[in-house]
Amino acid sequence: NAAASPDWLDAIARVAADETLDPAFRALCLRLPAEDDMAQTLHAAGHVPDPQAIYVARRRMGKALAKTLAPMLPAMIDRLTDHGPFTSNAQTAGRRALKLAALALQSRNDGGQAAQAIYSAANNMTDEMGALACLLDIGKGQPELARFAARWSADRIVMDKWFALQITYAAPEKTAEITRALTQHPLFDWKNPNRFRAVIAALAGNHAGFHHASGAAYTLTADWLLKLDPMNPQTAAR
């Protein structure tokens, strides 16, 4: 229940504002630690990790950091947005990573307005998926999900990511419900190992949702593994 450390917030703010630092490094610093990393740190310190408490603490950290960086985030995102043709190299990749890290925080401040704009203007998959993730993370993005599916429905690899993204960013109390709905989607083929993993593995990867007190995710996972095991025991075992 502790608040985010003022020293941590100040340190991240200094890194965010320092234009002499490598953009890729600044992006890493702006990203919140993964829930799995937080759980491992707690376990190593002799504590029993609580997925729900970790989820709440991480959300609180994100809110505090977004508030601290609020004065600089819009200008940072604008500076890092390349309006010319897409180029792929280490420098531009670092700029995109920093832009999306800043966008994830800004989405907590502006309700997703900047993310919607970047999604609409995206000329590369990194920006498109990244902006969509930012929207899903704040409980929005349904129109963008529909547009994404309409555009990429014929690309299996991309659609695997579309399925997984929705579950990865689902709120704990909605994770099982969203996963169940996706297993009823016309493009969900449980006999396709990659599509099955994109959905069920993503469910297991959403720790707070998977371990929700309702037990709904446990039941859903068990039902699907029992169905898959006779046909594809190797995938079921994974």
Where in this protein do the model-derived segments appear?
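Long, ordered, helix-rich scaffold segments
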Residues: 1-238
